[in-house]
Amino acid sequence: MLLKQVVEAHAASNGSAGARSIAMMVTQAGIPLSRYRAGRRMKQLGLTSTQPPSHRYKKADQPHLAIPNLLDREFDVTVPNKTWAGDITYLWTGARWAYLAVVIDLFSRKPVGWALSLSPNTDLVKKALLMAYESRGEPKGVLFHSDQGCQYTSQGFRQLLWRYRMTQSLSRRGNCWDNAPTERFFRSLKTEWVPAIGYPSIATAKSSIIEYMVGYYSSLRPHKHNDGLPPNEIEKKYWNAQKAVARNT
């Protein structure tokens, strides 16, 4: 039974999970398993973690706007839909690069909006924000943080933030650590899931990335920020606690 759970956890991660992640996933499934025991079982089964090095997308900064870094690396957010962070990366799709924009809720580190396109333009980040806004029930007063990429400082994107009544925050120029959660998400995506040679087509890339974000990262993958729980589980825990409080008031 244990060996079967280890194999299933490894397969669910697309072969990327190491002993620590497999131990958390199997334990969450109801079978207590330590990291070291997971490592021994992986060795017994001939399972390894395949995580190639990442490659960062270079962005064009637009530092002329007087928009402060309101987030100021305060990444520990206690409420969903309070602070979102956006970023762009690129993926090889057979004959050319495709560009992925995501929106991450910093409470759970869950990707709540995304868009994939052959052009890293303003429409790309607007589509990702629109998806996040609609899928999260059109929340009010969200702080949206990003780097100073031209897509995020464009008039079109800033107007969309204004329409949604969101406040904009920008990283300092050239400082990737000001948006560390999205950088870490992209690193996880590329090292855990994306094939080393990329995808054969943009359609294949889209299907695979959705599977990662929805089926694995949000639902199954243990996250250190959430004390080992996947984003969906930590959000479920939060909302259940809110319902309990409401019943008792």
Question: Which residue stretches match the model-derived regions?
Answer:
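An active-site-proximal beta-strand-loop segment
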Residues: 73, 77-112, 118-119
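Short small-residue beta-strand/loop micro-motif enriched in glycine and branched aliphatics
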Residues: 108-114, 168-170, 195-196
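RNase H-like two-metal-ion nuclease catalytic core shared by retroviral integrases
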Residues: 58-62, 146-148, 154-158, 170-190, ...
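Basic, flexible linker segments flanking DNA-binding modules
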Residues: 1-79, 175, 230-241
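C-terminal domain-tail junction helix/linker
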Residues: 162-166, 188-249
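Active-site beta-loop-alpha junctions of metal-dependent nucleic acid enzymes
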Residues: 96, 115-137, 143, 153
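Conserved, non-catalytic sequence blocks in retroelement Pol enzymes and Pol-derived host proteins
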Residues: 12-15, 75-77, 93-94, 148, ...
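Mobile genetic element proteins and their domesticated derivatives, centered on retroelements
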Residues: 6, 22, 38, 42, ...
